[in-house]
């Protein structure tokens, strides 16, 4: 959202392509349920996320295509039956991993139900938009052979991996792909029901990661101007009817909703030297577990259970399963710490090795030195 707002369309599209190889299709016909979690819902209306991503695709396409190159091959070959969203997704991510990929599509054009139904019959998306996504995938070195109806698995001898993305009702020689040994079934055929384009993309990506035995994408974290983010709070701005929606509150970079909605002020944002963003801590003694923070959280979390919890007594800590800390020796800065279900101890400024990750140590150090009033 930030890059689109700043007019950096190429960079925005490159981030989208890390996890979504069909930006034109999803930017046009996805159900955009991401907008249900947008913090702007609590102000006036959600940010037009899908629209902004389509703008990135449309305006960043030529620049990305000019630089897109297939990676060095790994020596493996994969055949994918079906050029719908799941098959195209798997093809893209396998190709990114260096696999030589060929997609076989029985129809005369690729795109699956998006092309045959949503485009040709419903008119919800243009053939040109679908074609641009397919061109992106082909630019990664993927070959797509249309008019190829594969009826037997032995037709694909010589491939190291064979994936079937034939849809929920798709058959191979009268048999369900799931009943044919050696086939990796993805998409709606894997789910056993008609799903969404986004779910099919995700399944294709999961299949590629399982085959490659490694992640095929990375998370991109952009630094935010926190003062600019804070300055937008409380401003009621309706979404524009067209064009870029600039109202994003950048919850991916600065999210402190749980500190604002807690009626007991049991969640607190703490600036920690050396860390990019303020860190959320949970104050056990102030929480009555009303669940407000979970209801308003735009992420899939429950801050009153997930965030590092500051306990006042050993009994309170023993009665909880939260990750958390308890100051046991104020004079030496010694803490009892629970992380990932394991108990350990940590001393601020101590010389002994610690099992705690550096961000956790920095947070504990900051609390002890600058926010000691929350520790007892």
Describe the predicted segments one by one.
Residues 1-77, 132-135, 161-286, 300, ...:
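Ferredoxin-type iron-sulfur electron-transfer modules and their immediate structural context
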Residues 2-7, 13-16, 42, 46-50, ...:
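Beta1-alpha1 glycine-rich phosphate/pyrophosphate-binding loop at the start
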Residues 21, 84-85, 109, 190-191, ...:
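Residue-level detector of alpha-helix initiation sites
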Residues 77, 83, 155:
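Cofactor-pocket helix-loop regions in the catalytic cores of large enzyme subunits
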Residues 89, 93, 261, 296:
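Rossmann-fold NAD(P)-dependent oxidoreductase module
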Residues 154-161:
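Core beta-strand elements of the Rossmann-like FAD/NAD(P) dinucleotide-binding domain
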Residues 298, 303-345:
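Domain-exit/linker segments immediately C-terminal to small folded modules
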Residues 338-376:
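Extended alpha-helical scaffolding regions
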């Amino acid at each position: 959202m930030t890059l689109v707002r700043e007019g950096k369309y190429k960079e925005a599209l490159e981030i989208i392509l890390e996890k979504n190889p069909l930006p034109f299709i999803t930017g046009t016909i996805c159900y955009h349920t991401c907008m249900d979690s947008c913090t702007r819902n609590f102000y006036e209306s959600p940010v037009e996320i899908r629209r902004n991503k389509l703008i990135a695709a449309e305006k960043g396409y030529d620049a990305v295509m000019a630089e897109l190159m297939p990676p060095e091959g790994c020596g493996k070959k994969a055949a994918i039956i079906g050029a719908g969203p799941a098959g195209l997704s798997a093809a893209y991510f396998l190709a990114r991993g260096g696999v030589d990929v060929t997609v076989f599509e029985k129809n005369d054009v690729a795109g699956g139900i998006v092309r045959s139904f949503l485009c040709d019959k419903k008119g919800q998306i243009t053939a040109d938009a679908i074609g641009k996504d397919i061109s992106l995938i082909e630019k990664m070195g993927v070959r797509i052979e249309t008019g190829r109806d594969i009826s037997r698995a032995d037709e694909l001898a010589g491939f190291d991996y064979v994936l079937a993305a034939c849809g929920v009702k798709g058959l191979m020689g009268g048999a369900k792909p799931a009943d044919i040994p050696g086939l990796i079934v993805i998409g709606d055929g894997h789910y056993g029901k008609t799903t969404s384009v986004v779910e099919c993309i995700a399944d294709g990506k999961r299949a590629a990661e399982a085959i490659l035995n490694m992640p095929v994408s990375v998370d991109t974290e952009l630094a935010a101007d926190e003062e600019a983010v804070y300055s937008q709070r409380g401003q009621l701005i309706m979404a524009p009817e067209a064009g870029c929606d600039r109202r994003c509150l950048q919850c991916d970079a600065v999210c402190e909703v749980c500190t604002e909605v807690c009626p007991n002020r049991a969640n607190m944002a703490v600036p920690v030297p050396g860390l990019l963003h303020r860190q959320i801590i949970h104050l056990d003694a102030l929480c009555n577990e009303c669940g407000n923070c979970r209801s308003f959280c735009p992420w899939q979390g429950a801050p009153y259970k997930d965030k590092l919890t500051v306990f006042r007594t050993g009994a309170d800590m023993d009665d909880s399963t939260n990750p958390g800390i308890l100051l046991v020796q104020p004079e030496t800065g010694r803490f009892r710490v629970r992380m990932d279900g394991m108990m350990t101890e940590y001393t601020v400024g101590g010389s002994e090795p610690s099992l705690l990750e550096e961000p956790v140590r920095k947070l504990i150090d900051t609390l002890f030195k600058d926010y000691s009033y929350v520790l007892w």
